[in-house]
Curated annotation (Swiss-Prot):
Protein name: Cell division cycle-related protein res1/sct1
PROSITE patterns: ANK_REP_REGION, ANK_REPEAT, HTH_APSES
Source organism of the structure: Schizosaccharomyces pombe (strain 972 / ATCC 24843) (Fission yeast)
Lineage: Eukaryota, Fungi, Dikarya, Ascomycota, Taphrinomycotina
GO cellular component: chromatin; MBF transcription complex; nucleus
This protein's record includes keyword Transport: no
One Pfam family of this chain: KilA-N
Amino acid sequence: MYNDQIHKITYSGVEVFEYTINGFPLMKRCHDNWLNATQILKIAELDKPRRTRILEKFAQKGLHEKIQGGCGKYQGTWVPSERAVELAHEYNVFDLIQPLIEYSGSAFMPMSTFTPQSNRKPTEAYRRNSPVKKSFSRPSHSLLYPYTSSNNMTSTSRMSGIHDALSLQSDFTRSPDMPSDSFTGSLHDIKASPFSSNNYAQSLLDYFLLPNTTQPPDFVYDRPSDWDVNAGIDEDGHTALHWAAAMGNLEMMHALLQAGANVVAVNYLQQTSLMRCVMFTMNYDLQTFEVVSELLQSAICMNDSFGQTVFHHIALLASSKSKMEAARYYMDILLQNLTATQSVDVAAQIINLQDDHGDTALLICARNGAKKCARLLLSFYASSSIPNNQGQYPTDFLSSKDMSFPENDDSPLNSKIEDNLIDNLKYPQSLDDHLSSKKPISYFSNKLTHQTLPNVFTQLSELSKCHEASLAEKQLTYNLAMEALEQTVRETETCQRLWNERTNNDENYLVNQREDLIHQCKKFLHTLKTARYYLETVQLHQLKKYVTYFSQIWSTDELADISETKNLVGHDTKTNRSSLSSKHEVDLFTAENEAAREKLVEQLCSLQAQRKQKINEILNLLSMGMYNTINTDQSGS
């Protein structure tokens, strides 16, 4: 039984015997029987920090070899079998690894005698219920890239693993009749066993299908020697692990993995358990996919008979609106797992893989209108510039706006899009390598790959440089503006401080000063009016005094002249009463004096008016123009 589970595989040019225990691979080198101590500690279910400490101490005690380059699964600390047995006894896993330690490889079938399983015909029942398929030119199953754990991976080993994976992938032939090489032959166990109608298969089907069966069959735990845990239990070649994974049955999955179930076993359509579980929503309903994907993550890099990866199947699930959220849930978890365990280039090539119709997972999502799934793929290095065999692009079904995250989206994936786009700009060669890995569909696609895209990247690089120069110039202008602003703020603060000192922080200082000034102006105007009044009074008094004085003088002289005239007239009358002309002369003299008096009064009035005007001008000059304004307002009112 154990011999059937031990397989000879070549990693980085080194042949090893591989034995899967509880979902973890354990390797023993064929040429020296050394074992991978790192994998033994993983089987003991120790976390990475503890494994690291144990291996550091263990390596100091004896012979060992650390492998960091090459294939990821082959990496780790290798020790002789004696030291491996010692380590296994220390952590109570010797019983689990004993079959591989005792295995000599003598009963192992030469790989050259393996027959490619794609030539095996399905059963009659399967052929009756299956649609007619075209002949597939790829091997029976395709492990696109050897799954690598991120635990012991460095940047150097990651790149080495990529080259090994690409070289292994190039070894796949396009003819199903070509004998399998060391890589394809080593995956002989991946193909599901033929359909079996024995009691084991029927019991497993009853467990999965009948509602009243809640406990796994006893033989799952007892593991009888005649039970093949990787055998197909239905007419489609599904193994028990396929069923358990699709139904989200974690208890059964753990039991099957403990029994040695192969994570990468496939059905007749070369579909793995991981592919089958994303075709249904049970793991979404139970929220168990995160655990299931961890258990089945070794199969994340595989594709089926139609060239479709697990991401293609999730995209197909998104064709139903009722299953859209489940598809997004599956897509998010698997993309996180893929990018956490694989390098950027390998992850991008797996995500952008085309099926037999040339469809990528992104194109299928776009065709189904699954915007959220498309956004997730774009945030994890998916390319929207890969057409299918009909020349269709994802942008033919969804606009760029539909496939971009909203600006107000606070999702962490929103910020990751920008980082991934920057990575794509920094490493455009990876995209060009992917596009050139397949034969161009037409002359135009070849021209696009080798001429247009490099020009686009060149233009983008120049645009980036121009943007950086413009940004530097704007930054300099901004710095100068900030310095000027800081200087202005400092001056403003100084002025404010001086003002506060002058006003004693009185907010009504200006109002109070204005009111005081108005009060002083009114007081000054009142003083001017009083001065004018007194000046007018004094001048009027003096004028009256002068008028009275001159009037008295005038009246006395006139009366004297009249008296003298009368005396003369009376004397003449007495002496010569015949002389009448003297009286007429007296009347003429009196009239002339009256006219002169009136003329003097007019001149006096004119002088009085001029005097008042001069006084007003003097007062207005002293009051800076306010006196006339106030007098005008008062006269108008």
